[in-house]
Amino acid sequence: MSNEYNWLRQLNLFFVATGFFTRLPTPSWVIADDNELKKSSRYFGLVGLLIGLICALVYWFTQQWLPTSVAVLLAMVAGVLVTGGFHEDGLADTADGFLGGKTFEDKLRIMKDNHLGSYGAIVLALILLLRWQLLVELALFSPWAAITGFIVAHTLSRVLAASLIFSVKYVTDLELEEGKRLSHDQSLNDLFILLASGIFVLFWLNGLAAFVLFISLWALRFCLCKYFRSQIGGYTGDTLDAAQQVSEIMCYLIILAVGLSA
C-alpha cells in the first residue's frame, strides 16, 4: 500500500507541475495545494521535456509541407499556446522592473504591474526573434537538430530556473522573508530528481556539446544568482521565468555553435 501511495503521490506532483506551467488538462483527482506545488518542483524539468516534445512534434509534422521558417514559427506558437506565455510574461515583467526601477522597492512594484512597459516589450521581442532565428538555423542544418534543440532547451531551461529556489532567497514586495524560501520546504531528493531530468536530455547531444552546455549553464546559473541578488536581493516568480527564457536561448546558442546531436 505504501508503494502504491508513493507512486500516486509522485504522479500527483507531476500533474500539479503540469497544471502550473501549462494549460494542458489534468485529472480531476489531482490535489494542487501550496504544499504539493512546492514539492512538485522536482518535476519541472519533466514538464519542460513534455513541452519540448510537443513543440518538436509540431515542427516535425509541419516541416514536411511548409518552409522551414514557417514550421519553426508554428512550433514556437504551439509552445506559447501550451504554456499560455507563462515565462514570456515573467521575462517582460523582470525587464521592466530591473531596467526601469532605481530602488529595490521600485523594481518590485514595477514587476507587479500588469501593464507591459517599453523595456519589457523590447526584451521580449528580441528574445522571440533570437529564438526563432536560432531554431531556423538548427532546422536548416537538419530537422533532427531542431527537434533536439526543442527537447533539450525546454527541459534544461526549466531545470536551471527551478534550481535557483534551492540557493536564492524568495523576495516579497516588502522585505526578504527567510521563512518564505521555497527551498526550506524541499529536500535534496527534490533537487536530485530535478537534475536527473536535465542529465537525461544531455544524452541527446554529442559529448563535446553536452559538456560545453553543462558548463555554460552552470556559469549562467551562477551569474543569474548574483544578478538577482544585486537587483532585488533574491528571486521572485518573474525572475525564475526570466531565467528560463535566457537559459533556453543559451541552449540553442551552444548547440548551434559547438555541436549538434550525435
UniProtKB/Swiss-Prot annotation:
It comes from the Bacteria. Its main location: membrane. GO terms for cellular component: plasma membrane. One of its GO terms (molecular function) is adenosylcobinamide-GDP ribazoletransferase activity. It is an enzyme of class 2 (transferase). The keyword Lipid metabolism does not apply. PANTHER family: ADENOSYLCOBINAMIDE-GDP RIBAZOLETRANSFERASE. Joins adenosylcobinamide-GDP and alpha-ribazole to generate adenosylcobalamin (Ado-cobalamin). Also synthesizes adenosylcobalamin 5'-phosphate from adenosylcobinamide-GDP and alpha-ribazole 5'-phosphate. Belongs to the CobS family. This is Adenosylcobinamide-GDP ribazoletransferase.
